[in-house]
Amino acid sequence: MTIVRIDAEARWSDVVIHNNTLYYTGVPENLDADAFEQTANTLAQIDAVLEKQGSNKSSILDATIFLADKNDFAAMNKAWDAWVVAGHAPVRCTVQAGLMNPKYKVEIKIVAAV
C-alpha cells in the first residue's frame, strides 16, 4: 500500500494521494476578501493542486464546503457555479461551521480521481 503525502507537516499534509485518489483541503489566501472572492480564490487553489497532480476539476468526486456564515451561501454558490464543470459536478455538502481562523469565510475539502 502506497500513500503519498505532499508537503507534510507535523499536523497535516497539503495533499494526500492513495489508490489514484487525491485528498485536499483549501482555505482562502486573501482574508480581507468577501465570501465570493474567498471561494473563487480557494477554487483556483484546487485547480492548481489538481493540475500539478495531472488531474482537473472534472475529476472531483466529492466536495465539502464549510461556511462560517450561512448568509454567505448565495455568494459561495455564485463562485462555485461559475467554476464547476457542467455535467461533472461532484457530490457536494455545505456546512455552517466555526472556522479556526475568524477571517476565513470558507474552507473547501475535496476528494478527486488522479
Swiss-Prot record:
Transmembrane segments: none annotated. One of its GO terms (cellular component) is cytosol. InterPro entries: RidA_CS (IPR019897), RutC-like_sf (IPR035959), YjgF/YER057c/UK114 (IPR006175), YoaB-like (IPR035709). GO terms for biological process: single-species biofilm formation. Pfam families: Ribonuc_L-PSP (PF01042). Belongs to the RutC family. PANTHER family: PTHR47328, RUTC FAMILY PROTEIN YOAB. This is RutC family protein YoaB. It comes from Escherichia coli (strain K12).
